[in-house]
C-alpha cells in the first residue's frame, strides 16, 4: 500500500513599495468540477474495485472496411484495461493536484475472487471497513476501465510513404463512496483518447514499428487514470 503525503507551505507576506509604472496582471480562473466535496473530506483512498481479468485483455476484434482509397488496413479492437495500473495512475494524479490532505492507494483488487468481470458496487459494510482500516474520510473506487483501439495503415501519395496510426479511446468509470451511506454518492463516466503514429517507406516496416498491443494497453491504462480527475477536481 502506498501513501502520498503533503506538507502545507506557509507563504510569507509581501512588502509592497511605491512604484511609478503599472503592470497588467493576468488572472487564471479555475473551472469548477462536476463533483463538489465538503470541506470535511480531507483524506481519500483510491481503491481497485474491478475483478482480475485474464492476461489476454482483448474482448473482441473487428476488421473494418477501408474508409478511403489510400487506406491499406483498418482494425478495431476492444479491451479491458489494466485496473491496477489505472488505479495507481488515478491516485498519483489526484495527489499531484494537492487538493486533498492525504491520498492513499489500496493496491489489492477487491473483486479478485470474481470469476467473470462485472461491475459491482461496494456495500455499506465494505465502505465502512475500508475507510476505517485505511484511516480515510471517503473512497474513490475504479469500477471499470475499457478501451477501443483503431489501428490503421494508409499510403500517403504526396509524400510517398506509409503512415500507421493507433488511436485508443479509454472509458474509465469511478464511483465515490462515503461511510454509512447506502450506495455510491456519485458515478463519474468519462472518456478521452490517446494516439500514436509511425511513418515509413514500406507497409511491413510501419507495422513492425507501431506500438505493440501489450505496450498500448499499459500506456492507455495509465492515461485512463488521469481522465476522471478533471471531473472530480477544479481545473
Language model segments and positions:
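Soluble periplasmic/extracytoplasmic beta-strand elements of cell-envelope proteins
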Residues: 45-48, 139-143, 169-175
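C-terminal motif of bacterial Sec signal peptides marking the signal peptidase cleavage site
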Residues: 15-18
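Generic short beta-strand segments
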Residues: 49-52, 143-151, 191-195
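N-terminal segment of the mature soluble domain
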Residues: 50-141, 145, 181-186
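C-terminal/domain-edge helix-coil "capping" segments
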Residues: 20-41, 169, 175-235
